[in-house]
Amino acid sequence: MKKNLISRLLKPRLLSRIKNKIRSFFFLDQWTVLLGRDMDHKALAWSDLRTFAPPLDRFWADPFVWLHENQYYVFIEELLYSTNRGYIICLTLDKDLNVVSNQVVLEKPYHLSYPFLFEHEGQLYMLPETKQNNRVELYRCVKFPDQWEFEKALIDNIRALDSTLLEANGKWWLFANIQEEGGSGWDTLNLYYADSPLSDQWTPHPLNPIVKDVYSARPAGQIFIHDGRLIRPSQDCSVDYGYALNFNQIVTLTETDYAETHEHVFKPPLKGGILATHTFNSIDGLTAIDAIQLRWKFE
């Protein structure tokens, strides 16, 4: 009897479960935001990033940076563990990247995350994830940074995750993971196109899903140009949700064809209590990512 008990305890799965149970009693796996200056995607280094951690009752994720009147603002998803419903807040930073204010800027009765920001014809817009409301919703900024009005639904009757817009080749392109009922939201990337970001007539790409791969499908931030090449950040969810960042070069983008190649990966380190990272955004000299970090529960 004693021998059988010892044998069971030594099984890897059971040992792992015991270890995780002990860890979860003392530590919290918390999404946090990290900022750094003048870093492109290939120069990312954990040692050069400064962590901004929320209180222990919530997490911060999906940071998007905006520069307004020479001051940096970081729009992020905040989620209270007690409600499990995300909303959008904005951190206002001083010149030394200290947080001088923190305010809720958009909240709904349903979950919001991934506050994708873009400017069109002098107007600032936000395209947050609104999958829980079964459509892709666009918001217009009426007073920066904390007043946003609903503009329109770009696509109805769709469970879209991490919608990401790009203007290129005379069109506007909308990248998003589409989650079917009961299915995964990690491994299929769909593409839509229109003549304007304000259109409500988005044409599905004929090759949808354009990426079918848990390693690189799900968007991870704004698509950007580096050395003349279009780079699409994506999540590597092969180990777990949002485990690492991939950077993929878009080599073909037309109404009939799409192709991309993997360029670079940025993984969590093997030390320091950093377990995952799944968002990258960089604008005007400030880079923002997020990370799951182990935090002592009894601070």
Which residues fall in each region the model found?
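Carbohydrate-active catalytic/glycan-binding domains of CAZyme proteins
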Residues: 1-299
